Amino acid sequence: MNPDTPQTMAATNAHKDIPGNPSTVMSSRIMLNDRSNGKPLKVLSETDWQFWVHNGYVVVKNAVPREQALRTAAFVWEFEDKKPDDPATWYSAPRAEMQMKELVGSGMVEVYNHQRLWDNRQTQRVYEAFTDIWGTDQLWVTIDRANLNFPLRPGDTFKGFIHWDYDPETKPQNVQGVLALADQTDENMGGFQCIPELFRTYDTWKLSQPADRDRFKPDITGFEDQLVKVRLEAGDLLIFHSMQPHGIRPNHSKDKVRIAQYISMMPAEENNEALRQWRIKSWKERIAPEGYAFPGDPRGWEQNKYPVAELNELGRKLLGLDRWSKGKG
């Protein structure tokens, strides 16, 4: 294997030109949980549930143990070949070209299948939070990356952004998520931002927008004071509806670094054998998804430096290696 050649997997056609993650389908055939199944919530409280319905996002405290989150953060630093206590190592040119230009300078870390990432994906509390959101136990986890967002330097051009990963006109049955790997309680240090008011009023708002508007980047004029900067502590999981306009805010702190892992789940597509095999190959060969927002790591470090992640019983099902319905696949 040539370490200078990025190892990626061809995305489905549906994801070639949109930001969404190609390790799962764009929209589930199963509707998000409306509680009509009568099942009790496992992780979310009733207050959490009402907040989710009204605001389009919810924070699950201590979704993974704090120490586990910090271990993952230490790995992200290692993978990026940077030192947390030496700012001189923090800034370097991008290793690969990002087609999705608003992500340039946002700190995306092109690692997808390391053991530390899978440890978080197969944590029971993370899984059960998503079962509350979906109302089904049979889920697949996204194969997604991490983020290391450094303080801006004079002359840096990253201004943050608000977007959708899926066209809201399609009413996607999908959710996304981000796990804090370090405390993000200082609003100046970058991190997740969203506009719940636009989430709530989208159908009315769109009537005032031009027909040829960018379906993925809303004009947020009038919503500037409605931006919510969500505070998280290491180990907290934020889940948000894919209809939620969201993005990364710039890091205006002096020396604080935002570190996160992107994790989401959606109903398993066990009849989609091509996608199931695609996911297994990604895990087994430590290969990144290929898509509009996923350039991969040209160094090939996942393939050359790290072994295949070990999966527990839950992890095997969340990947698709074992089937929820029939045992082993």
Predicted regions and their residues:
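Non-heme Fe(II)-dependent double-stranded beta-helix
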Residues: 2-54, 61-169
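Non-heme Fe(II)/2-oxoglutarate
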Residues: 15, 29-34, 82, 210, ...
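Extracellular structured ligand-interaction cores
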Residues: 57, 143, 172-178, 189, ...
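Short, solvent-exposed loop/turn segments at secondary-structure junctions
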Residues: 65-67, 147-148, 167, 184-186, ...
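Short, structured patches in soluble enzyme cores that scaffold and shape functional sites
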Residues: 145, 150, 164-166, 175, ...
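Short, surface-exposed loop/helix-turn segments at secondary-structure junctions
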Residues: 158-163, 211-224, 255-257, 276-282
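Short, conserved beta-strand element in jelly-roll/cupin
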Residues: 167-187, 231-234, 239, 264-267
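Double-stranded beta-helix
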Residues: 184-247
